[in-house]
Amino acid sequence: MSHPTAPSASVAASNLTFRWPDGTNLFDGLSLTVPRGRTGLAGANGAGKSTLLRLFAGLLRPSGGSVTVGGNLAHLPQNITLDTALRVDAALGIDERRAALRAIESGDVREEHFETIGDDWDVEERALATLGSLGLGGVELDRTVGQLSGGETVLLRLAALLLERPDVLLLDEPTNNLDLFARRRLYDAVDSWRTGILIVVSHDRDLLERVDRIAELRSGSVSWYGGGWSAYQEALATQQEAAGRMLRAADADVRRQQRELEETRIKVARRQRHDKKLDGQRKAPRIVAGERKRSAQESGDRLRGLHEDRLDEARERREEAAEAIRRDAEIKVSLPHTAVPAGRTVLTVRDLSLPYGRLREGSLQVKGPERIALVGRNGAGKTTLLRALTGELAPSTGEATAAVPLKFLPQRLDVLDDALSVADNVARTAPGTTDNQIRSQLARFLFKGARAEQPAGTLSGGERFRAALAATMLAAPAPQLLLLDEPTNNLDLASVRQLTSALESYEGALVIASHDLPFLESVGITRWILLDDALRETDAEEVRERFGSPESTPAGTA
């Protein structure tokens, strides 16, 4: 991905303000300068990462302040759509130069052909080399986009951007919907970036390990951390440890100030009673006694006021310390009815072939609370297999039989009715469950109080996933087999952690189709199944090796 030195590469924002049409501010006075090299832009869903990239790319206009970009900029958005009838060379933006080269080679030396080519006489060789570096060496320039898989289409669009020799490259969730092979090719491209500025938004931890620094977008401001994802997490842990100490010290200070204030009140009251008693014994003149009482009252008020001020200051310091603590809520739910005895047969697949994908004859038996990762190239048929396991899709031959209640959570999250509230969506899947029981469980899925009444159609991406997960896991009868299709796609890392904590509470069998290896390893996978023309047992190490090698599966076969 390297290219000639780009001295003009620069990205900066000065006092940047951006507000949505409803008047909501996303950024208010944001200023930053992005250094050369690879920067990972991290932050929760809704923090504004994609919006910031679009502002850098000039696709959105600031409401105030300025964005300055120096050099040639290229932007890879999250959602890529290409005309399926488009030829690969046209998608790469080199079709006119190729045509001019062919014309000159055939003897047509009109000036217009030379003007089209300019100095780019090796454009075809560069295009093929770029495709090859991204694992698309088997893709011919005359093929159509419709012959490529979804992952290959993303890599093709990236190749087109690289051929522009950008000084600034913006990548927005580039590994979404990429299989492990395509991810590895993209990782290699990021590893090879040497000059200019690369900014990548991603929830892919393996990708974020490859950047030079992390820029965390949080509450409308940016904090910088040197190194990749692990270094960033270590820095956050150190910060949180220090913040925890500060909070404990602030709590202790508040308690001390409260104690001293109470002691002061007692002392002042005791002194006033004592002075009043003395005045009575001395039979002091009323005017003298009154003056002495007023003086004592003022002295006591000053002393109390001093300690009250100290207590207020201690409480303010406590609030500041508490704000520095990150509280990423976790899903902790009890699901005892999902438990499956260790020896019980949960799922049987015999000699299965599918109408779509690559599976020609696959067999599999799942017993007890096994946790199975289903891996394979894009187009291999993982989603098709999951649909066949649910009975939603009839296999071409063979059979799949579930011996326990099962639930399927698809990528599209279409288990939700957008017109219904979160609570009503769960009630649909859990007939016979009382409203109080539903709300009690939803609170554990972080939908507390009025949040459970929110219509599903108004939820953010992470909230929508939690609602769909709740409707799936809280279903009646309780699912003892759970099928998940690419569950971490489009989730921020906080939502991935919430999913992981929810699955820790699940006691049934799991089958998860995913390309997210760190996630799979975090949920305690016990078996790895590779889907190709058969269902084959494998392991995490082989999966990494297999999909890290371009020779493992030729481009264009997925």
Predicted regions located by residue number:
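ABC ATPase nucleotide-binding domain signature region
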Residues: 38-39, 51-112, 368-438, 515, ...
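Hydrophobic anchor residue at the start of the ABC signature
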Residues: 158, 186, 469-471, 488
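Conserved catalytic loops of ABC-family nucleotide-binding domains
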Residues: 189-200, 502-512, 520
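Conserved beta-strand
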Residues: 13-16, 25-37, 65, 349-367, ...
